[in-house]
Amino acid sequence: MKKLAFIGVLTLLMSFNGIAQQINWVTFEEALELQKKKPKKIMMDVYTNWCGPCKMLDKNTFQNPDVAKYVNANYYAVKFNGEGNDVVKYKGNTYTNKGYKPEMASRRNSVHDLTYAFQVNAYPTIMFFDEKGDIITPVRGYQNPQQLELYLKMFLNDSHKEIKTQEEFNAFYTAFKPEFKG
């Protein structure tokens, strides 16, 4: 009986250990409000419901325990549907998707005004913002955990401010040693 109880407890502990850490996603407006209390940079995943690489980014990169832990500790993470129907307030403007069609929610839909304002023209795009909510830069396309790690660390430490040329970025990229497991 004691053996059975021990096996049950051991199984329970192992199942808790196997639960992957998740990114704590918030809305863009929530992230901007949180910045007022505790300044952090923002990482925004601009995705669509129909985008295959967006789904790969979710599954392979954002569910990676190293990515989730690092993002949660250092960034406010935002998921924004680039073709969704959310009403978003940013920098004194209100952004909507006037052409949104609910029946097209899982297919290509009208592009959200905020997506246009950020000049996002490819999905997925990961937008990075500084502690004041100003855009640092977009990073277009699928990123595996190690590729995203480079940008997460570069922007967190403001290393990007020292990089002025493509050659300097190439040197930074070459010297970077990823630590995230893939």
Region locations from a protein language model:
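Bacterial Sec-dependent N-terminal signal peptides
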Residues: 1-22
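Short active-site neighborhood of thiol/selenol oxidoreductases, capturing the structured segment around
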Residues: 38-52, 77
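A short beta-strand-turn-helix
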Residues: 24-41, 71
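Detector for the c-type heme attachment site
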Residues: 55-59
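Solvent-exposed coil/turn segments that connect beta secondary-structure elements
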Residues: 49, 82-83, 132, 144
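Non-globular targeting/processing and membrane-anchoring segments
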Residues: 21, 119, 130, 136-182
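A short, hydrophobic beta-strand/beta-hairpin element that forms part of a small beta-sheet core
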Residues: 43, 113-117, 122-138
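Thiol-based oxidoreductase modules, predominantly thioredoxin-like and allied folds used
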Residues: 22-25, 64-106
